[in-house]
Regions:
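A conserved short coil-to-beta-strand element within the FAD-binding core of flavoproteins
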Residues: 1-14
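Switch/communication elements of ASCE P-loop NTPase nucleotide-binding domains
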Residues: 8-11, 23-30, 65-67, 72
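Conserved flavin/dinucleotide-binding core of flavoenzymes
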Residues: 13-15, 40, 61, 76-254
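Short glycine/proline- and charge-enriched loop/turn segments
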Residues: 44-51, 163-167
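Central beta-strand plus flanking loop segment that forms part of the substrate or channel wall
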Residues: 49-77
Length: 257
């Protein structure tokens, strides 16, 4: 697999370069996190506001640690499927079945818990987690067999777990990724207006992007859901009549006026 390095648009199509290969298409749906998007050379280039969003939008801190054990060290009555919360920096804990015997524990570290452990190397991070877990299950260190770590916050392709707007960022960057860039439509949880940072937002964005590509192919101007109606509502002070279609998202939009 090769990373996409450039996307060049022409009058009749798009050329996507990945490694030494170039792929051509009529249209492209770009569903990569903002961190990855910032590493792709776009022609034509992104707008100034979009470039600012690439550099300034916050992403949540998130790491995952998979601890492997020779055997389960907890009793059958223990419920570890996301139901253990700790103030010792452990986050949320799940039991995951191993393919060949043994047992695995998946630990999700997020927020400050993940941020603090960035100062540790992989093995140091695992040791810190084992020390804390061993207080609950004293036989855990003796049954420990290995680990795997995924640092989403430090991953150059993700830059974090999901979109997490900071102060002032909603006002500056909300809805800017809903508008296609010529033949390129943007998708992903970070592009959804109502549910950013969620699976539902990602699904909604895919539906929107597909609809936009369909409109572009048909020679139509893609319509941003709710945008035309919101603009009309701002110009007309009188209440809507029964014959007019109300904007279902107006209440949410007014929160940021």
């Amino acid at each position: 697999k090769s990373k996409v390095s450039s996307i060049v648009q022409a009058k009749d199509g798009v050329a996507v370069k990945a490694g030494s290969e170039t792929y051509k298409a009529d249209y492209v749906v770009l569903a990569v996190p903002l961190k990855a998007l910032g590493q792709i050379q776009m022609t034509p280039s992104l707008s100034g506001t979009q470039m600012s969003a690439l550099k300034g939008t916050n992403y949540g801190w998130r790491d995952q640690i998979l601890l492997k054990f020779k055997r389960p060290v907890w009793d059958d009555k223990s419920r570890l499927s996301g139901e253990i919360f700790s103030d010792q920096g452990l986050g949320m804990i799940w039991v995951e079945p191993a393919l060949k015997g043994g047992a695995n524990v998946l630990i999700n570290l997020s927020g400050d818990n993940a941020r603090v452990l960035q100062a540790f190397g992989d093995r140091q991070m695992v040791d810190q987690v084992l020390i804390r877990m061993n207080k609950f299950y004293p036989k855990m260190r003796g049954a420990f067999a290995g680990y795997e770590i995924r640092r989403y916050s430090a991953d150059p392709g993700t830059g974090g777990s999901y979109l997490a707007y900071g102060p002032g960022q909603v006002t500056r960057f909300w809805r800017i990724w809903e508008q296609p860039l010529s033949r390129v439509a943007f998708a992903g949880e970070h592009t959804d207006a109502l549910y950013p940072g969620t699976i539902e937002g990602a699904l909604r964005s895919g539906k929107r992007a597909a609809s936009q590509v369909r409109d572009l192919y048909a020679g139509k101007t893609p319509v941003i859901e709710g945008a035309p109606m919101v603009a009309k509502a701002e110009k007309v002070a009188a209440p809507t009549t029964g014959g007019e279609k109300k904007n279902p998202f107006a209440w949410f939009t007014r929160l940021f006026d």
